[in-house]
Amino acid sequence: MTSNEIMRIFADTAYVRTGGSPEELRCAEYLKSYAESLGLSATLEPFTVSLAAIKEATLTLDGESLPCKGYFCAGDAEIEAPFYYLRNTDAYSLSLCKGKIVMVDGYLGYWMYKDILDNGAVGFITYDGNANYADFDIDQRELRAPLQKEGKIPGVNINAKTAIDIVNRGVKTAKITLSQDEFEGNSHNVVVDLPGEIDQYIVFTAHYDSTSLSQGSYDNMSGCVGLLAMAEHFSKNPHRYGMKFIFCGSEERGLLGSKAYVAAHEEELPKIVLNINLDMIGCIMGKFIACCTTEKDTLAYLNYFASERGFGISVRQDVYSSDSTPFADKGIPAISFARIAPQNTATIHNSYDTPALMRGVQMEEDIDFITAFATRMANAVVCPVKREMPDNMKDKLDIYLLRKRAPK
């Protein structure tokens, strides 16, 4: 795949495609069609996702209405209460949430939500964006399923500049009105199957959905381009192990596509020896990394292999927040490759993730390295990455998947 062909795919898919949306399906069909144009057989595998349509979402602070977006799947409510900005998460600070609409810093994860709920919050406000950027964009957020199980309270998202302003003004009272229709729809995985000489597989994953403001070129059409290029390569070259290329839907909504694939293909999992995941490669700036949810010997192997190839890499053992994780949780060793740019050169999950961040030549270099590594794995007599999950990775998987809380 040439640089020009790579950049054409970025141009063709430069639109927002949130999980479960018509635009996401449009992109799935594009990837399927592109794979078929390469002579590959591709299938769409649907899976159910929760969806919502906001009818009304308002935030009023001390009588002034401010721009906001209501959280999907956070129910219907009209709540007026004292405003409280939760700066710290110690027991005293959390105790002040009782009976209040609480604004929190950063992403509203499961444990933060549980803490404010357990301490009596009646509503919540989050914010995103950057105070140093000119835009007043507001991301569309959702109350994910694990949070819903703890109970629903209404919430809205605002821009960071608005958050600074309301704290600076010393706002006292907040009112949230939220009304929405909640329903179910479909997202899709696109699957390409390349049988090998033996009945064991290496699974390649990359998600193709985006967040609500993003064209998703860097995160993560780049990974999908990598999968297309590798699928084309291995369709023309021998490989002892079979290969499955899975373009995952709804990753940005909680790894829903890879979770759905693992659940729907339980009988296949013992045959999978390795997962190779691509999430954010080929950016103009940044360093190339490999995050290995594997035994530690894999790190040395990758460092040696990169030195042999003359390719710069930073390798670590960890859990990567991407579609590799559901496979690792089933005991399948998983390696995620990415090129991580400094935040002042390329950002994600906002309107600045566009094809302008990408470089065709860098994409080619990254894909060539990953393909070379995959070739070693695919033609090994025995896959050298042990099919076992060390205890330290099991512990990190438990934390990431919310089965236990990280120590403070």
Each PLM stretch: what is its role?
Residues 64-67, 74-91, 139-217, 232-236, ...:
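Soluble metallo-hydrolase cores and metallopeptidase-like ectodomains found primarily
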Residues 199, 212, 248-347:
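Metal-dependent peptidase/peptidase-like ectodomains
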Residues 35-36, 106-107, 117, 200-255, ...:
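Alpha-helical metal-binding/catalytic segments enriched in His/Glu/Asp
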Residues 68-148, 152-154, 313:
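Extracellular/luminal Protease-associated
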Residues 232, 344-408:
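His/Asp/Glu-rich mid-to-C-terminal helical/loop segments that flank catalytic regions of hydrolases
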Residues 8-98:
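Noncatalytic luminal/extracellular "stalk/propeptide" segments of secretory-pathway proteins
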Residues 14-22, 32, 103-106, 151-153, ...:
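Second-shell loop/turn segments in exported
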Residues 1-23, 38, 132-144, 209, ...:
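N-terminal capping segment at the start of a domain
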